[in-house]
Each structure stands twice: as structure tokens, then as C-alpha cells.
């Protein structure tokens, strides 16, 4: 942004955050946060300095639900202008054990929910709701960009 008076250029700080749809067959991992938002949500969190967004996906799912994931697929992004955030939506698959070990400091609920039992948020504005709706309607496509790296096993697990 350029000031019209002094012509000083200021670059806004944008904070990347991920929203993660973790898939386990015909079930999706849904959460509810301990405070604030009262509707179903997906795993979410901010990218740390020096971390790729794919590493953020793995770390946040492990921190909030105690689950390993793989087959990370970028879906799409959504700006969240009032908070200077850019939300990056990903789908991924549970890797191995699907037993949830919920972070009770952050979440009050985390569970695998069958496709036909998913209750969507009111309104159509959020990337989270769009991703839950895609899964509920069995419209998650597997053609989204898949992250692969020879170092996948060395990433946060």
C-alpha cells in the first residue's frame, strides 16, 4: 500500500494459516473449540517461521488430535481480511492409528463423523464450511495438488 501523501510504501503482514480436512474412509475429523466458535470446525492453525504449510498441516493435526496424516492435498485459499490472515485449505488422510488424543486445552470436541451425519455451519462464507460440505456430498476430488517429498518421514509426525 502506498501513502497518497508521502508515497511511503508499506507491505501488509499476512499470516498464513491452514484448515485441514482429515479423511478416514467415509469419516471426517470434526472439532469444536473450547472457547468462542460454537459450530463444527476442522483442524486449523498458523504456520510458524521456517515451516512449510505442509509441515503445518502435520503439526497441527498431531497437536490437536494426536494423529499422523499423509497424502496432503491443497484445495484452495480464502483471505480473512479483518485479521490479515490467508487461510489455506488442505485435505489429507489419516496415516495408521486413527485413535484421537484431543488437546483439551484448545478443543472441547474432536471425533470422526460419518459423511451423512456432518452438520454444516450456517451460511456459505467460510472455507471450513465449504470443505465440510464437499466431503459430506462426496465431492472431494483427488486431483488437488499432492505434496510429496523424499523427506516426508522426517517431517513433523
Model segments located where?
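Cys/His-rich short segments
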Residues: 1-21
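Conserved beta-strand segments that form the floor/walls of ligand-binding pockets within enzyme
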Residues: 2, 29, 41, 89-91
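Conserved active-site beta-strand-loop modules that form the wall/rim of enzyme catalytic pockets
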Residues: 17-32, 37-44, 54, 71
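Solvent-exposed residues in well-ordered beta-strands and their adjoining turns
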Residues: 23, 93-95, 114
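Nudix hydrolase/Nudix homology domain
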Residues: 37-40, 82, 103-157
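The catalytic Nudix box helix
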Residues: 42-76, 90
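Active-site-adjacent beta-strand/loop module that shapes the phosphate/pyrophosphate-binding cleft
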Residues: 78-101
Amino acid at each position: 500500500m502506498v501513502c497518497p501523501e508521502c508515497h511511503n510504501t508499506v507491505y501488509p503482514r499476512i499470516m498464513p494459516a491452514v484448515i485441514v480436512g482429515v479423511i478416514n474412509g467415509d469419516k471426517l475429523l470434526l472439532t469444536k473449540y473450547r472457547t468462542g466458535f460454537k459450530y463444527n470446525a476442522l483442524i486449523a492453525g498458523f504456520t510458524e517461521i521456517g515451516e512449510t504449510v505442509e509441515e503445518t498441516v502435520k503439526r497441527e493435526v498431531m497437536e490437536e488430535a494426536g494423529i499422523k496424516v499423509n497424502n496432503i492435498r491443497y484445495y484452495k485459499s480464502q483471505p480473512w481480511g479483518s485479521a490479515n490472515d490467508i487461510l489455506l485449505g488442505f485435505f489429507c488422510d489419516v496415516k495408521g492409528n486413527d485413535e484421537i488424543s484431543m488437546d483439551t486445552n484448545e478443543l472441547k470436541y474432536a471425533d470422526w463423523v460419518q459423511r451423512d451425519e456432518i452438520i454444516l455451519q450456517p451460511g456459505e462464507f467460510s472455507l471450513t464450511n465449504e470443505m465440510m460440505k464437499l466431503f459430506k456430498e462426496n465431492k472431494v476430488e483427488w486431483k488437488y495438488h499432492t505434496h510429496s517429498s523424499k523427506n516426508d518421514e522426517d517431517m513433523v509426525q
